[in-house]
Amino acid sequence: MEWYNPLCKYDKVYAAKVFTFTPDYNYYINANQIEKGGTGYDIEKVLPIEVDRLQPDYSIYNIDSNLSYGFLTRGCPNRCKWCVVPKKEGKISPYMDIEEITAGRKKAILMDNNILASNYGLQQIEKIIKLGIKVDFNQGLDARLIT
């Protein structure tokens, strides 16, 4: 796995985008096969669970070596007209354990859509506190649920 280099030939190139309005990469891609995914291409298409839960190879990114990214829950109980999450992921449900995401690292950026709306999410937050992991709840926290 490596970042795409237009000077190289590849067996397979994966391209993804979140939004339909994101412009496509309109240049020649030197690959035998090109796989496009993400909600920007097809809201119905999903990855096999064993692929979706793979953790990134952090060594190819220029980030803090003690940092990890992930989701503890997927889905959302709200049905905001403008949001694709309930349609794509369904109701909120457990997804991964914090220790699977961090794998010994002490910092995490969590991208859950509504972690406080789930008992599992609350249990994971208690575990995060117990393990002393510093967390950035990147998508925010629903203030209506913090009481």
Protein language model annotation of sequence segments:
Residues 58-89, 105-112:
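N-terminal pre-triad scaffold of radical SAM enzymes
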Residues 1-69:
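Glycine-rich beta-alpha loop elements in corrinoid/cobalamin-binding modules
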Residues 14-18, 85-147:
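Core AdoMet radical
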Residues 35-40, 44-47, 75, 132-136, ...:
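Glycine-centered flexibility motif
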Residues 22-24, 42-46, 78-82, 89-91, ...:
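Short catalytic/ligand-binding loop motif for oxyanion handling, primarily in non-cytosolic enzymes
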